[in-house]
Amino acid sequence: KQLKLLFQLYERYDSAISTSDIYDELSERLLEELDYRREAMNMQLYQHMLADEKKVQVPSHIPELSTNRLLTMNWLEGQRLMVFLDTNPDQATRNEIAKTMFRVWYVPFYYYGVIHGDPHLGNYSIAKDHSINLMDFGSIRLFRPQFVAGVIELYKALRDNNRDQAVDAYERWGFVGLDNEAIDVLNMWAEFIYAPLLENRVRPIQQMRGGKAGRDLAGKVHTELKRIGGIKPPREFVLTDRAAVGLGSVFMHLGAEVNWHELFHELIDDFSVDALAER
């Protein structure tokens, strides 16, 4: 009720975003955060999805020490990111951690249609061998194969400057009733989010996401959304955007200098909607 009231107050003050689907999505995810049986199953799911990833550890659920109100798992030794960065790791180490984080988040998404929707700094740690300990499996989202295909399709649309393909991608995501002005604003946002992936070269992510340029673009998108009467983001959009922005922040903390385009293509080049649906 409090969350709904906050969203209602926000919409009265700011018409840029219609929050009804955002409220429905976050309400459902927050309730799932309290379902420890579900979180234990999510943990097992991530152990399966990341079984071939050598640089990540997922804790194991200990059922005999767990109840509906208590979730117990084995201990994973590691340092929080900011503590680790205080040790002044070299650039190569920072880059390797960033690459691992990218795969930890997006192998499940592109191969299984699943995303960890909460990449804040408390939900993973860095082990001594610089692998990742992934934690907190309460905010896990399953996506339609067509939605995942739409994420890839939008990348190709931006790369090829194909407006019709971008519109098709937004519709796969669940946007409805988009006019030309709304599409222009969404493309402005998308070019910002996808920027690290579009050029096949090593780039520090802070060149594209940080500082005044990022703030100016966010302000411009917000202003334009208000001018055109706002948009209504579909439910599935919420956690994918949250994950992308959250990971971008992690990569900026790391000061990562990586070929993001290459990493992305390692995951999508063999993508098949049918294969994803079968998995």
Show where each model-derived region lies.
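Short, surface-exposed helix-loop/turn micro-motifs enriched in polar/charged residues
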Residues: 14-18, 38, 53, 116-118, ...
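Catalytic-loop of the protein kinase fold
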Residues: 111-121
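Hydrophobic "anchor" residues on beta-strands that sit immediately upstream
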Residues: 70, 116, 132
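Conserved ATP-binding subdomain of kinase catalytic cores across diverse folds
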Residues: 1-82, 96, 100, 112
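Residue-level signature of catalytic and energy-coupling elements of molecular machines
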Residues: 39, 72, 120, 136, ...
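Hydrophobic residue at the +6 position relative to the catalytic HRD Asp in the kinase catalytic loop
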Residues: 122-126
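Helix-rich C-lobe and terminal helical cap/extension of kinase-like folds
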Residues: 24, 67, 76-78, 83-100, ...
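Flexible, glycine/threonine-enriched loop-and-boundary segments that flank and lead into catalytic domains
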Residues: 103-110
